[in-house]
Design a protein with these regions (language model features):
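Mixed-charge, low-complexity intrinsically disordered regions
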Residues: 1-83
Length: 83
């Protein structure tokens, strides 16, 4: 199954940290789509990355020990309240 982007959902970066996808924004000059995402640790800062790169496979040549197939992968987080 190909990787897909879902706004408002949590993704895990292949190095282990978690991020919330806030939006997709387009570059005003090129129209290239970028993912706007917030880190779910530390200061909760916002980050921006090209959509194609966000959804790309991990470079297994460079990161041969990476467990994930994709750079960012959607996480299914169960409700603490049981919903």
């Amino acid at each position: 199954m190909p990787n897909e982007l879902r706004i408002g959902r949590v993704y895990r970066h292949f190095k282990g940290d978690f991020y919330l996808v806030e939006a997709v924004a387009n570059d005003s000059e090129t129209g290239e789509p970028f993912v706007v995402y917030r880190k779910l640790y530390g200061d909760g800062g916002l980050w921006l990355r090209p959509l194609a790169m966000f959804l790309s496979p991990v470079d297994k040549t460079k990161y041969h020990d990476a467990a994930q197939e994709y750079r960012f992968e959607l996480q299914e987080i169960p409700s603490a309240a049981g919903h």
